[in-house]
């Protein structure tokens, strides 16, 4: 299974989105859950990726059918859904993203995804990519069943939320054991597994566990660290 190297985009800038594609990322996560801009900024970010080989995955705030439909109609290659805790919630993601008979997404052939009617699919409608975020102890317990849902392409760990949830519940489960369990569930069902990578030193461990969707930090974090580093250099001159 191919390893996809990506990054999270929270700033909402088409220029930054375009730059990420120019740099060669396999995918970008355009964030509507924690991002700085509203849904209205999304179409121009997707336009910035046109002509590139970079996949556009949009994190929706929740799998509301109208929101998921608009995101995919605008041309996103797939969605990431936060806080998928149960099989029913995973199936709800598939229902919102897929056309009948697999789901209940409404059909319009004049949307941007199909060139406003100029690039209609010749055969079967394209399949959206669906990344289900595993971010709680409950989700870890259901990871095997979630991975078994047809239409879910990968389990994606939210490290911050998962760590917080385990601490808030005083869970006896060690974080690393949860990561291992999620990765195993994905492997057992031939699904991808992903995570937001905070430390480059984790590379070998994640590779050994079979992670295939890796997000290398975010645009805001990279800008922040660049600002801090340059300011530190400038102040050393004074």
Stretches found by the model and what they are:
Residues 23-27, 73-78, 97-99, 149-154, ...:
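Glycine-enriched alpha-helix->loop->beta-strand junction motifs that scaffold or abut catalytic
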Residues 28-29, 57, 80, 156, ...:
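Conserved beta-strand positions in the central sheet of alpha/beta enzyme cores
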Residues 1-64, 95, 130, 148-152:
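Conserved N-terminal beta1-alpha1 strand-loop-helix module at the mouth
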Residues 64, 105-116, 134-141, 173-238:
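C-terminal alpha-helical cap/extension of soluble enzyme domains
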Residues 66, 76-150, 159-163:
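Conserved anion-binding
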Residues 78-92, 155-166, 211-230:
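Glycine-rich phosphate-binding active-site loops on the catalytic face of alpha/beta enzymes
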Residues 7, 20, 31, 71, ...:
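Conserved, mostly hydrophobic/aromatic
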Residues 39-73, 95-102, 123-125, 172-194, ...:
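Alpha-helix-loop-beta-strand connector modules within alpha/beta enzyme cores
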